A protein has these predicted regions:
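Non-catalytic, surface beta->alpha helical segment in thiol-disulfide oxidoreductase systems
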Residues: 78-103
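Structural microenvironment flanking redox-active thiols in thiol-disulfide oxidoreductases
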Residues: 59-65
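Conserved redox-active cysteine motifs that mediate thiol-disulfide chemistry
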Residues: 26-43
Length: 103
């Protein structure tokens, strides 16, 4: 399963009402470290299919969502469970560290 593209339109259903954890990658296409994280996010989306949702928010297209999560730097990775942020990491991270957020 490919990662979700999270937008204002699907945010409520895909994130806030999700019955499984949601890992969100706030990114932009012009951001080098964000592009480095892309393959890691894709791998986690495949590996955690059915156990967690993995999605991406393009901060250039979804400024309101970025502001709502207080994103000041990208990439920012946020884990949401039961509609609440439970973990957050800023900057490019190794796969093991991002995966540990899901544990």
């Amino acid at each position: 399963m490919a990662e979700l593209k999270i937008t204002r339109e699907n945010f409520e259903n895909e994130v806030m009402k999700s019955d499984i954890p949601v890992l969100i990658d706030f990114w932009a296409p012009w951001c080098g470290p964000c592009r480095m994280m892309g393959p890691i996010i894709e791998q986690l989306a495949d590996e955690y299919e059915g156990k967690a949702k993995v999605g991406k928010v393009n901060v250039d297209e979804e400024g309101e969502l970025s502001q709502a999560f207080g994103v000041m730097s990208i990439p920012t990775i946020v884990l949401v469970k039961d509609g609440k942020v439970v973990r957050q990491a800023v900057g490019a991270r190794p796969k093991a560290e991002v995966e540990a957020m899901l544990q």
